[in-house]
């Protein structure tokens, strides 16, 4: 993404945090095939609760977009992400006998709730589209980076129980969606005042750190499912 200077700088600045994510117990165990199904099931539940609120960040971004072209980008990319993620996630949930309708009545764990509150605050109270994108991009971009690295480092992971999830996020289609979102963010952040650009960097970093806390949280299973 060297042709996207603002987004590229954000990613480079936060790579140390993303590398910490890759070293978390949850992802290490997924990589070596020792992750318990209880932990994975809990991850799926937390991810489902997260995605419900995540979609709202896109909705705020759409309302703050200033052109029809930008609005269409939000719509098409959100549709891709939801369809791509939902298909695999729902299949896993079905294998565990979990219905999404039942999951939605559960409370997010504190680490997840703190992440959601951070994103919602940035999108709701930000000046415009840029803040919404800074809130949602760390999740999307870091997932692509993490699972590409994981698959490259341990190709055999694709043949494990978790392979479908890994392959989803390491796929060319997901990478293309990340690229499109990065381009949208670059356009939204071009010409920002130094003060607002600094706020956007702060939001991006905060959400990257929440990603780390989310992965750390997933090392222990929920006790209510």
What residues fall within each predicted segment?
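Basic/polar N-terminal segments that are highly enriched at the extreme N-terminus
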Residues: 1-8, 12, 223-225
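Hydrophobic alpha-helical segments
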Residues: 2-6, 119-120, 216, 220
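Short alpha-helical hairpin
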Residues: 11-35, 54, 182-191
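Alpha-helical bundle segments that constitute or directly flank the non-heme di-iron/ferroxidase center
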Residues: 15-20, 34-64, 84, 134-144, ...
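Secondary-structure edge/capping motif, primarily at the C-terminal ends of alpha-helices
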Residues: 61-65, 122-126, 150-154, 188, ...
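Active-site-proximal alpha-helical scaffolds that flank and shape metal-associated catalytic sites
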Residues: 69-176, 205, 209
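Long amphipathic all-alpha helical oligomerization modules
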Residues: 173-205
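Acidic, carboxylate-rich catalytic segments that either coordinate divalent cations
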Residues: 199-225
